[in-house]
Structures are given as structure tokens and as C-alpha cells.
Amino acid sequence: MTSASVATGPVLTHRSALLDRLIDFEIEPGAEFVVELLPAGYSLSAEWGSLPKSAQDSDNGIVLISVVVAPSELPPRPRLAMLPPFPIEEASDSNSFDDLRASILVDRTIGIILLRLGHWAVAIAENGELVVTKTGSRYVKNQHRKGGQSSNRFRRGREKWIRELFDQAGEVASSRFREYPGQIDNLVLGGDRVVLGRFLKRVKLPDGIGDRTLPNRLSVDQPGRKALDTAARDAWSYRIYELSNDN
């Protein structure tokens, strides 16, 4: 009887660091691995039951790495579970890291929109490198302490400021995305979930890019150039869970 595995994480790991780790696995003396790439809609076996709900049903699919243990009659032991930043298109099951490495290295171009009330940032990134950036702001007052008609006027004014912020960010994003000479594969969003939801309802982005929004929303304190640099890195990062035996 094998002992249960306990999952820890996730740790956000950039694809370059992940590629280095795959090399370490390959040169590990006497180790043999099973590498599974599972598209969305997968079902995990009991050995992976300690993974959190977010890993049990990822819209991008999941990568599972297990270690083959002796004697060979025993099932492979879970080692790593990875939530990829982009959707897994085709299932794979092998003793090689070749399919995983090929998936990691696929060329991609993404649009990025970071939005919080008062600030926005727009970018296009090719394989993790920013090639187009634009940032801006629009004043949106947060609080009003008086009641009555004054409060109603403030609320109407605030809604107007928010619409103007959305329109400003949407116009710039649409312009930059439309002018880009290549294909934008996906859209990545960062910022406040509610604000982003309202933004997408108001603004129609070109070429149906809004329909290709990736499920992982990026964490952003204040949209700007520094936040775009971080977003481009995080957009090509994997969420990795380590699994160890609970003895």
C-alpha cells in the first residue's frame, strides 16, 4: 500500500526556470518519470486528491509529473502538478519531457489590459517580451460622506468618471490591438475582477479578442509600466504544486 501524497503550493514559476528544472529531472540518476499533459475537462485519480479545487478543474488543463518507483508493479508516485498559463490543446502521456518542453516553447502573442479605478495599462507581448505599451489614468473619487441629494450627485458623477475611464482605456486598447500587424492569440487581464467585468461589458475589443481571454486574472496593485513588466512575466509562468509522501 502506498502512502498518501500531500500537495504544497502553488509557486508561480516562469517558463525559463521550469525549463531548467526539466533538465535537472533528466539528469537525476536512476530516475524515470511519467509526464501527462491533460486538456481541460480532465479527471484526476485518487493519488492527486490532495490538490486544491483550482487544480482539480483548471480551464487551461494540467500537467502531471510522476516518478516511477521500484518494484515496477507499484503505481508511479506523484511529484509535480502544474497549471499552465495557456490551454493544453492535445493530451499526452509519455516517459519523456519532449511534449511538455514543446508546449512550453510554443510562440505566442498576447494582449494585456490592467485596470483599476483611476489607472489603466495596455500592452502587447510576444513570447514574454513587451513590444507595445501604453499607460494612463482618469481621476475617480472613491468616497463621499454626505447623504441626500449631494450623495446622489456624487454617485452620478462617479459613474460618469468610471465610464470615461473605461472608454479611454478601451479606445487605446482597441487602437493598439487593431494596429498590431500580427495575430494576437489571447487576452490577459489584471486588476479588480468587478471593474474588469464592467469594463468588458462596456467596451467591444476588435477581432473577437475578448472571447480569447485567458482564465488566470493577474494580481495588480496599480496599473503602470512596472506592472506591465510583471504581468508579461507572470503571463508565461506556471503555478506549480509539489507533492510529497505523508509518512
Where are these regions (language model features)?
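Terminal alpha-helical anchor/extension segments at protein ends
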Residues: 1-247
